[in-house]
């Protein structure tokens, strides 16, 4: 006998936990929240310590560890595509960079038919609703939300300040808040970390206040098999628990909400019979609704590192040495302070590489150590690096289910670097980064260029380095996009076109990828749509001012000119 709820939410990630918390604020509403992973164990430093952010990517307890098909423009590499597994979803394993995107991203969404209420000023109140910033609220930031946001503090690593100053010396603006009036420029970077130095996942921020409500049922280790339909209406789901092959059925009186992320949401729809007819028929899946955009329009951010030796012993290199780690861990565990309490991404920036870009097309994260994002290939000396990536690539990929089996990973292809714009942006980005790194502010610290290496100069040499070393920034999105065109999957409220009682609410419904990290925006989307589901009036539009570059020059004259090939 199946259980029955008002709403079934598939996926307890950044969006799913937000929705579950908001929907169950109405005491008469019952919600079933299904999560394929396990709990977010609060004593597991791998997910709770900000500085340990690389650890969850190295195993499969908290990571789906997807891989792409061979990427044709990246020497056929199968690229890593980590996604969070467990309460919190990818907010449980991400880099904790609290970046919202550029105001022009959302104004661009709102220019699309059917998305008129997605302007930046419509979205800003929901960013504020979700946030508690440690230095207090203002026109751009909240003070009472579930997501704890920490700002960089005086006394942090001197390399952060030097790298921001170098960006300004190279001719770019200085900004005091990458989520405030002006994103463009270099400045301190906020992070999703609590005042006690713990990761602020949506499991901690949202579910901690909701999980004891009698109208919320949370089932972990529950892998959703498919959505059940009565004609074109979603009426429930079947799921597997643990290693069992027995299907458990749950029924939804009102809606099934798919919040499984940009990889798994389109895969679940396809397995359930909602997607491109030819694909479904090739997998012997009965077609419930032919919807060609399901799994298409896939987008991501690609990035690479420029690494330098550090001539002063101020980098985090000693923290990589095992004999120093117990003391770091103890300070974090008992005091919530020290190196362990930060993700160490405390400075960054956004720039335009050419005048045709009307808002930034390159993002920087600065890190005071030289190491891969997943913790591999740490340079065995003092060093620092700039993560540099393009923001709005024209490349488009796709997600395709391979079978009806929910345990089989889908076919994933991003088509990285498939357009000439991609190559131009990365070549420009590397050369501009070298100019930034050559500025006087970094003279006390800058040693040799470790990667790519000073001898890598020509377009051909740079292209080879990009093909071999560029990596995902772990920002898959847009694979069930909002809109009204033939390839749109959902409307501006997340309702699946042609269906009843079925929504998708997560990063997959972004029509176009944003300029920056995705987590804060994914939470905002869920906050905004939760009001739609509950029949509440939207929050009043913000009246905050925001920067538009217009005809402003891309950059000023650098303090130090650098000759490059």
UniProtKB/Swiss-Prot annotation:
FAD binds at residues 6-35. Its cofactor is FAD. GO terms for cellular component: membrane. Pathway: Amine and polyamine biosynthesis; betaine biosynthesis via choline pathway; betaine aldehyde from choline (cytochrome c reductase route): step 1/1. One of its GO terms (molecular function) is flavin adenine dinucleotide binding. InterPro entries: BetA (IPR011533), FAD/NAD-bd_sf (IPR036188), GMC_OxRdtase (IPR012132), GMC_OxRdtase_N (IPR000172), GMC_OxRtase_C (IPR007867). Its EC number is 1.1.99.1, 1.2.1.8. One of its GO terms (biological process) is glycine betaine biosynthetic process from choline. Keywords: FAD, Flavoprotein, NAD, Oxidoreductase. The active site is at 475 (proton acceptor). It catalyses: choline + A = betaine aldehyde + AH2; betaine aldehyde + NAD(+) + H2O = glycine betaine + NADH + 2 H(+). Signal peptide: none annotated. Involved in the biosynthesis of the osmoprotectant glycine betaine. Catalyzes the oxidation of choline to betaine aldehyde and betaine aldehyde to glycine betaine at the same rate. NCBIfam families: betA (TIGR01810), PRK02106.1 (NF002550). Belongs to the GMC oxidoreductase family. This is Oxygen-dependent choline dehydrogenase. It comes from Pseudomonas putida (strain GB-1).
């Amino acid at each position: 006998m199946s259980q029955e709820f008002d709403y079934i939410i598939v996926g307890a990630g950044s969006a799913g936990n937000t929705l579950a918390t908001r929907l169950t604020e109405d005491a008469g509403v019952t919600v079933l929240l299904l999560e394929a992973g396990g709990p977010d164990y609060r004593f597991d430093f791998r997910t709770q310590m900000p500085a340990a952010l690389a650890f969850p990517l190295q195993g499969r307890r908290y990571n789906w560890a997807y891989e792409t098909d061979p990427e044709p423009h990246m020497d056929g590499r199968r690229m890593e595509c980590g996604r969070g597994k467990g309460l919190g979803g990818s907010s449980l394993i991400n880099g904790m960079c609290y970046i919202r995107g550029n105001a022009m991203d959302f104004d661009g969404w709102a220019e699309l038919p059917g998305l008129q209420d997605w302007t930046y000023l419509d979205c800003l109140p929901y960013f504020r609703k979700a946030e508690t910033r440690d230095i207090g609220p203002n026109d751009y930031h909240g003070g009472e939300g579930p997501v704890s946001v920490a700002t960089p503090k005086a006394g942090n690593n001197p390399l952060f300040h030097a790298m921001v100053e170098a960006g300004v010396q190279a001719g770019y603006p200085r900004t005091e808040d990458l989520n405030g009036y002006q994103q463009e420029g270099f400045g301190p970077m906020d992070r999703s970390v609590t005042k006690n130095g713990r990761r602020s996942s949506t499991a901690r921020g949202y579910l901690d206040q909701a999980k004891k409500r009698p109208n919320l049922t949370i089932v972990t280790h529950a892998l959703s098999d498919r959505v059940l339909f009565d004609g074109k209406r979603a009426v429930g789901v079947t799921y597997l628990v643990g290693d069992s092959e027995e299907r458990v059925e749950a029924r939804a009186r009102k809606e099934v909400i798919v919040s499984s992320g940009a990889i798994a949401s389109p895969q679940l729809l396809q397995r359930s019979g909602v997607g491109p007819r030819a694909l479904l028929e090739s997998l012997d899946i009965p077609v419930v609704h032919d919807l060609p955009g399901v799994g298409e329009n896939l987008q991501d951010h690609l990035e690479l590192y420029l690494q330098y030796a550090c001539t002063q012993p101020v980098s985090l290199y000693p923290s990589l040495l095992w004999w120093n780690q117990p003391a770091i861990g103890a300070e974090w565990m008992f005091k919530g302070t020290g190196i362990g309490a930060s993700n160490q991404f405390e400075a960054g920036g956004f720039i335009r590489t050419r005048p045709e870009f009307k808002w930034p097309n390159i993002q920087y994260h600065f890190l005071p150590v030289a190491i891969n994002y997943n913790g591999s290939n740490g340079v065995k000396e003092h060093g620092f690096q700039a993560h540099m990536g393009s923001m709005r690539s024209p490349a488009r990929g796709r997600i395709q289910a391979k079978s009806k089996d929910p345990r089989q990973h889908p076919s994933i292809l991003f088509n990285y670097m498939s357009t000439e714009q991609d190559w131009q942006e990365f070549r420009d980005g590397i050369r501009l980064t070298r100019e930034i790194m050559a500025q006087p502010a970094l003279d006390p610290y800058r040693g040799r260029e470790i990667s790519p290496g000073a001898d890598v100069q020509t377009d051909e040499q740079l292209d080879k380095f990009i093909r071999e070393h560029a990596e995902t920034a772990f920002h898959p999105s847009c694979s069930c996009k909002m809109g009204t065109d033939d390839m749109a999957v959902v409307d501006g409220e997340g309702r699946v076109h042609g269906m009843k009682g079925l929504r998708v609410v997560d990063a997959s419904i972004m029509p176009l990828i944003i300029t920056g990290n995705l987590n804060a925006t994914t939470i905002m989307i869920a906050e905004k749509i939760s009001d739609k589901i509950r029949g509440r009036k939207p929050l009043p539009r913000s009246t905050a001012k925001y920067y538009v570059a217009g005809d402003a020059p891309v950059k000023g004259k650098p303090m130090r000119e650098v000759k490059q090939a």
